[in-house]
UniProtKB/Swiss-Prot annotation:
Protein name (database record): Elongation factor G, mitochondrial
Entry GO MF terms: GTP binding; GTPase activity; translation elongation factor activity
Family designation: Belongs to the TRAFAC class translation factor GTPase superfamily. Classic translation factor GTPase family. EF-G/EF-2 subfamily.
Keywords associated with the record: Elongation factor, GTP-binding, Mitochondrion, Nucleotide-binding, Protein biosynthesis, Transit peptide
Pfam families named among the record's database cross-references: EFG_C (PF00679), EFG_III (PF14492), EFG_IV (PF03764), GTP_EFTU (PF00009), GTP_EFTU_D2 (PF03144)
Main subcellular location of this protein, as a coarse class: mitochondrion
Length: 744
């Protein structure tokens, strides 16, 4: 039976799946419970904003029979994409939260996480990649590799996630998949090659060529349900032969079997190529590149086939846990992915969400089996929970299941936990899985309820959102008597402000954005501080000697403490108190009141008293030591620098460059393509506020930009002077003149 025959009967299959219930497994949930390990894929769909991720997911759900009809992003048909379940998402046409779903394709169960592309929601991508086995990296054939693509690529590398690349939007004016492949090699450092080629681009996009099987694929009828195989068009055969040879050549560099065939000048069979692509993709030494246009319903079914052929099942990925016993070094253990239930259950909570029926906790099962009615233990808190319901998720809809196995993604109700917690059924298992990397917030805003009577709802909203999203922080600043929220960008905080009004009927007022500046030393500074207090009875005595020194630039967002003492001048039981005193003082600097960072506290020596020394005495000694360094050291203020990418028609290039220069930007690169240009620049975040409106007005609404955090860097002398003056005015303090000169 040909592919076209198979796919012509898919609507009938979908009908029986949804309506007749005549299959052995009456629903996707039932099928998922019985799937074998080799027939499971856990994948994420990640990319830069507006690359077409949500549209692609909508097509996948339709072709696999999961939904009966397709809807568009931005809710143009008043419905909106299935995976954008939040009303705000459908209005703005962006994905804010990672929606989870599962579907079935060719008897394989596929769990899909659709992730946000906007940099302000990057923690959602982190959470998704942590629990996935493979990913589809979606790239726009016009925009190519953009700023958030670089971020997603780094995240995939951090969690060692194998990926396929899908170059989308072949139908767009200016589509150039060949340029995008070049960017993947130069900017992402991927060993990538086409395994498909487009048959025409823009309005002439007719289908794709499968270079592995050497066949042309056409997607007939309006919905693209029928995939028709045909011979490669005559005018494309030379190009296809060249690209296939390029594919074989790149595979030969990373796969021994293909390398031998290449040296012997033998032509590999399609089976040889598929085996080599799978092996090298799993090892992350090769990235297969597919093409298509999700909006025009071309290339989606072959992408699904590639997910089955080239991405790993849960048994092909090594998942580690740590055995953490008190007083012992943590031991690494490999978790058993077999779906036989012989080993005890181990799961990781990777996302929290307030649902209609209480808190919803998303988990991935890494080992064993979990059944409805079982009791689970939170390893961190030791709390025991009995499970009344197990559910699988389809966007914001739920299907109850009786049990879940290793490799499954599911959700629970009524479990009090934090994101990154490990759950087990055996309380003796002291296992902990690696937690999820959470970036520090870069922007703060003052926030308050518009009406004082809404304070209760405001408190509930803040408590829920800070629990759901670890990058959303909430604090009260006693110096300015303001409540502050911090996050990954203006959009991040604006979205939460709008959600407070929509979901809690609590309108809020946001203040002007405030940048998270940092303070650090320019050069090492020694300290020798004695804290001594005698007031009758037991006194206080503690002396600390050491060096406070700046860390290298790539570590300027952290602070470190090292105990380099020899002997018993500083008893070991007092060292944690010294570290505590240092970290408390690091919360507020002298120049601008911002946190200290990029510093290393080296404790070299000290002294104690047999009676008067205590933890409090040494903590106060450490604080006194930092105060002495405030007075004697040379300090500077650091500011977050953003990697900015601006795209606009080329007639506005001079204007855009001028605007970036005015905002203290450093141009790092430019690109041009068919009447459009892209500029890459590094700009201080403090200078980026209000840029969106300025860019729109100066480019007649045609320009767009994106930015992501790059690093902390010393701020300009005039900015440092201004920050110091503002802080002094608010505190009524004066700083010695020597502090106001930044030493290089």
């Amino acid at each position: 039976m040909t592919i076209s025959c198979l796919l012509r009967i898919r609507p009938a299959l979908a009908k029986s799946f949804f309506e007749n219930g005549q299959r052995a497994f009456a629903s996707h949930a039932a099928f998922a419970e019985h799937a074998k390990l080799e027939r499971i894929r856990n994948i994420g769909i990640s990319a830069h904003i507006d690359s077409g991720k949500t549209t692609l997911t909508e097509r996948i759900l339709f072709y696999t029979g999961r939904i009966k009809e397709m809807h568009e992003v931005k809710g143009k048909d008043n419905v909106g994409a299935t995976m954008d379940s939040m009303e705000l998402e459908r209005q703005r046409g962006i994905t804010i939260q990672s929606a989870a779903t599962y579907t079935v394709w060719k008897d394989h169960n596929i769990n899909i996480i659709d992730t946000p592309g906007h940099v302000d929601f990057t923690v959602e991508v982190e959470r998704a990649l942590r629990v996935l086995d493979g990913a589809v990296l979606v790239l726009c054939s016009v925009g190519g590799v953009q700023s958030q693509t670089l971020t997603v690529n780094r995240q995939m590398k951090r969690y060692n996630v194998p990926c396929l690349a899908f170059i989308n939007k072949l139908d767009r004016m200016g589509a150039n998949p060949y340029r995008v492949l070049g960017q993947m090699k130069s900017k992402l450092n991927h060993n990538a090659a086409f395994i498909q080629l487009p048959i025409g681009v823009e309005s002439n996009c007719k289908g794709i060529v499968d270079l592995v099987k050497q066949k042309a694929l056409y997607f007939d009828d309006q919905l693209g349900l029928t995939v028709r195989e045909d011979e490669i068009p005559q005018d494309m055969r030379t190009e296809c032969d060249e690209r296939r040879h390029e594919l074989i050549e790149q595979l030969s560099n990373v796969d021994d079997a293909i390398g031998e065939l290449f040296l012997e000048e033998k032509t590999p069979t399609p089976q040889d190529l598929m085996g080599a692509i799978r092996r090298s993709t799993l090892k992350r030494t090769f990235t297969p590149v597919l093409v298509g246009t999700a909006l025009k319903n071309k290339g989606v079914q072959p992408l699904l086939d590639a997910v089955l052929d080239y991405l790993p099942n849960p048994g092909e990925v090594e998942n580690l846990a740590m055995i953490e016993k008190k007083g012992e070094e943590p031991q690494k253990v490999f978790l058993n992915p077999a779906r036989d239930g012989k080993d005890p259950f181990v799961g990781l909570a990777f996302k929290l969400e307030a649902g209609r029926f209480g808190q919803l906790t998303y988990l991935r099962c890494y080992q064993g089996v979990l059944k409805k009615g079982d009791s689970i233990f939170n390893v961190r808190s030791g709390k025991k929970v009995r499970l009344a319901r197990l559910v699988r998720l389809h966007s914001n809809n739920m299907e109850d299941v009786n049990e879940v196995y290793a490799g499954d993604i599911f959700a629970l109700f009524g479990v009090d936990c934090a994101s990154g917690d490990t759950f087990v059924t055996d309380p003796k298992l002291e296992l902990s899985m690696e937690s999820i990397f959470v970036p520090d917030p870069v922007v703060s805003m003052a926030i308050k309820p518009t009406n004082t009577k809404d304070r209760d709802n405001f408190s509930k909203a803040v408590a829920r959102f800070t629990k759901e999203d670890p990058t959303f922080r909430f604090a009260y600043d006693p110096d300015v008597k303001e409540t502050l929220v911090s996050g990954m960008g203006e959009l991040h905080l604006e979205i939460y402000a709008q959600r407070m009004e929509r979901e809690y009927n609590c309108p809020v007022t946001l203040g002007k954005p405030k940048v998270a500046f940092r303070e650090t030393l320019v050069a090492p500074c020694e300290f020798d501080y004695l804290h001594k207090k005698q007031s009758g009875g037991q006194g206080q005595y503690g002396r600390v000697t050491g060096i406070l020194e700046p860390l290298p630039p790539h570590q300027n967002t952290v602070i470190e403490f090292t105990d380099e003492t020899i002997g018993t001048n500083v008893p070991k039981q007092f060292v944690p108190a010294i570290e505590k005193g240092f970290r408390q003082m690091a919360e507020k600097g002298l120049l601008s009141g911002h946190k200290l960072s990029g510093l290393k506290f080296r404790l070299l020596d000290g002294a104690h008293h047999i009676v008067d020394s205590s933890e409090l005495a040494f903590m106060l000694a450490a604080q006194g030591a930092i105060k002495s360094v405030f007075e004697n050291g040379s300090w500077q203020i650091l500011e977050p620098v953003m990697m900015v990418e601006v795209t606009a028609p080329e007639e506005f290039q001079g204007t855009v460059i001028g605007q970036l220069n005015k905002r203290h930007g450093i141009i790092t690169g430019t690109e041009g393509t068919e009447g459009w240009f892209t500029i890459y620049a590094e700009v201080p975040l403090n200078d980026m506020f209000g840029y969106a409106g300025e860019l729109r007005s100066s480019t007649q609404g045609k320009g767009e930009f994106s930015m992501e955090y790059s690093r902390y860097s010393p701020c300009m002398p005039d900015v440092q002077e201004q920050l110091m003056r503002e802080y002094q005015a608010s505190q009524g303090i004066a700083v010695p003149d020597k502090k106001q000169k930044k030493k290089n």
